[in-house]
Amino acid sequence: MKFKLLIIALTVLFAFNAYGEDGDVDLSFYTGTFDVIDKEGDDQTSLFGIEHKNPNLFRDTILGKFKPVTGGFITGDSSVYLYTGVEGQYGLGPLKILPSFAPGYYEKGDGKDLGSVLEFKSEIKIGLEIFENSKLSYSYSHISNNEWGDTNPGTDNQHITFSKNF
């Protein structure tokens, strides 16, 4: 079931690229560590994910520049997280600071029980454009259910992201 959900999510993400014009799709691929601050040491594992952003939906507001973000990841313990939310963009010289917030669906698989299927991801990403339309970033995120579930252990994750605007 978890694998089917991930395949569906990836298919939808790649479908955006098939129908978009040149420069309409920003795809990110990332890998890193799930539950990086695991006190017990039994839930830490690897993660791999994909994220989609549409530059055409980019909005410049009084609070900054924002665009929608949709993505998902799977961990080495078969946990799956699918999310959609909003990402801000702030420039600091050649660096981009990209905070984001995204509610999503979490399935624990054989991994960490986060207490609910509804989980919220807050993330801070620092990126640097390495080639034209390509960015390399470091991200740190926290996922928790805001005490809406039976338990709320939360998880902190870190990963490296490669983004390409097609």
Question: Which residues does each PLM region occupy?
Answer:
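Residue-level signature of outer-membrane beta-barrel architecture
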Residues: H52-N56, G88-Y90, L128, H142, ...
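Cleavable N-terminal export/targeting peptides
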Residues: M1-D22
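Outer-membrane beta-barrel initiation region
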Residues: E21-P55
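Outer-membrane beta-barrel "beta-signal"
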Residues: S46-I50, L128, P153-F166
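Transmembrane beta-strand segments that form the barrel wall of outer-membrane beta-barrel proteins
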Residues: D26-D35, L63-T75, L98-E107, S139-S144
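Solvent-exposed loop/turn segments connecting transmembrane beta-strands
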Residues: V36-S46, G72-Y83, G111-V117, E147-T155
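Membrane-embedded beta-strands that build the outer-membrane beta-barrel scaffold
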Residues: I50, V86, I97, I124-I126, ...
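Short loop/turn motifs that connect adjacent beta-strands in outer-membrane beta-barrel proteins
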Residues: Y19-D24, P55-F66, G91-I97, N133
